[in-house]
From Swiss-Prot:
Gene3D superfamilies: Glucose-6-phosphate isomerase like protein, domain 1, Helix hairpin bin. CDD domains: RPS2. It comes from Stenotrophomonas maltophilia (strain K279a). GO terms for cellular component: cytosolic small ribosomal subunit. Keywords: Ribonucleoprotein, Ribosomal protein. Residues 233-268 are annotated as: Disordered. This is Small ribosomal subunit protein uS2. PANTHER family: 30S RIBOSOMAL PROTEIN S2 PROKARYOTIC AND ORGANELLAR, SMALL RIBOSOMAL SUBUNIT PROTEIN US2M. GO terms for biological process: translation.
Amino acid sequence: MPQVTMRQMLEAGVHFGHQTRYWNPKMAPYIFGARGKIHIINLEKTVPLFNDAMNFISSVAQKRGTVLFLGTKRSARETIKEEAERCGMPFMNQRWLGGTLTNFRTVKQSVARLKELEAGETDGTFEKLVKHEVLGLRRERDKLEASLGGIKDMNRLPDAIFVIDIGHEDIAIKEAKKLGIPVIAVVDTNYNPELVDYAIPGNDDAIRAVQLYARAAADAVLEGKAAAPHAASVREEEFAEAAAEGEEKPARRAPAKKAAKKGDDAQA
């Protein structure tokens, strides 16, 4: 599991919460105190919860599962994209489209349209069209790429979602809960940690803090993937043995021999 120390969290500003007047009482167990009307998060509470969350992400990846990285607020967009791509997971970093999870079939149709437009750009289809038609198709492609480009290779619903700001991504979290998809999320002092399955009490605004969370999540995915090949090789050996047994069976099929014998008797 990726190791993140309390000192690293302090340096990234993970301990800085929101203004005290905006706090959510459900976060009280994770608040150390206040400084200048800003709540200070107790990192002694954050570290074990952070480790639990990263362990869960790693376990999902080890089982060949998919973790959707989600962060559409400005301070998270670039980091979410970079880290998701680094670990080979889908992401959304521009705007959450309502129904992305609960109406996934329709979303897949939009993704198919995006792939169709991308193919048209490279296979010569666009060259046969007039200029204004090409411009219109490229605008459509760019719009779809911005909203769905990060999930165009996600062929099924994710097994978990990693979220930076639960207030900013409240619609996504509601969809995930409705479908029973586990949510791992950074929860600042102004939100309810009970809304997610794995809450990480911490600053959800500071860029360095966001980078720390996303980098650790990506490392957890990579670690989980690295632990998976042994199980995969065992399954491949089992499939190979089953295939070998299947190839031997047709030569020993008694019914085929009986049918051939009946044919010989008829000729006699």
